[in-house]
């Protein structure tokens, strides 16, 4: 199994656990809601999210004074939706738990806060 497939599998598992734990907001509106309430520790977009989605979520980050940056996942919208157990593709997710956010950041080799 390639390293990319291994990372994608682990990310899918982490996002699934975070959703079951109630620590994940799936979709654009839910993710922006976590920014408004300042509950988000990390926000990510699918690899194939549209330019419009990226632009709007980046604008929402700025508008709400968030210090978070938008991370890109190696998962497609379909893969992300499957990981969350939804029949629909999901382009944006926010994590509301520092532990899950840290674990995903480590898998993606992102700098820690």
Question: Where in the sequence are the language-model features?
Answer:
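Short secondary-structure boundary segments
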Residues: 47, 73, 97
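C-terminal structural segments of small proteins and small subunits
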Residues: 81-111
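Amphipathic alpha-helical interface surfaces
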Residues: 11, 27, 31, 39, ...
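N-terminal positively charged helical leader segments and presequences
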Residues: 36-64
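Short active-site oxyanion
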Residues: 21-22, 40-42, 65-70, 91
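Mid-chain, well-packed structural core segment of small domains
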Residues: 59-89
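Catalytic cores of RNA-modifying enzymes
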Residues: 1-9, 19, 99-102, 109
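N-terminal first-folded block
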Residues: 7-45
């Amino acid at each position: 199994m390639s390293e990319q497939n291994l990372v994608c599998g682990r990310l899918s598992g982490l996002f699934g656990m975070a959703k079951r734990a109630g620590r994940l907001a799936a979709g654009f509106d839910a993710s922006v809601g976590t920014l408004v309430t300042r509950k988000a520790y990390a926000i990510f977009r699918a690899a194939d999210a549209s330019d419009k989605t990226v632009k709007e979520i980046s604008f929402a980050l700025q508008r709400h004074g968030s210090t978070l940056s938008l991370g890109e996942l190696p998962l497609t919208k379909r893969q992300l939706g499957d990981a969350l157990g939804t029949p629909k593709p999901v382009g944006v997710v926010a994590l509301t738990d520092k532990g899950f956010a840290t674990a995903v950041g480590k898998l993606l080799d992102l700098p820690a806060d």
